[in-house]
Amino acid sequence: MKMVLLIGLALISLCSYGQKNDSWKVVLNNLEIVYSNFSNELRHTRTVSIAEIKKPGFLEIHYFTHNAHFNWFKRLLVFDENDNQVYTIGFNNSTRLPNSFLKSLFTKTKKLVIYALVEPSDINKTHIIKQKRSHLCTLVLNE
């Protein structure tokens, strides 16, 4: 019985050790386009058509954090092809951007780069911890 308990505790600790990375899912019009736990701009670039953007629907971002980041503040950052920030919004674990809003952003640029910024909810810790934006996905408009 003790051996089973020790093996169980070892497995639990190994599982929790392996779950250090945050992960995210990006969904466009109820279709999952990215699910990942690491930033890779080339791999997470998706082409979207004007017809997809004209449909009624949403771009949904679901961000899953490990326990250490559970109560941290998250921001979604949207940049254009020239690395100019065009939109930002704070969110808890998920957020939705309507296709009509994406369409208005795509009138100004043909490429949207979406990042997440995770920072401590305690403002006194923000200067201690290096904040880095994580690339979630890139949307390129195909005309």
Residue ranges: model-predicted function:
Residues 1-21:
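Bacterial Sec-dependent N-terminal signal peptides
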Residues 19-143:
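Terminal leader/tail segments of proteins
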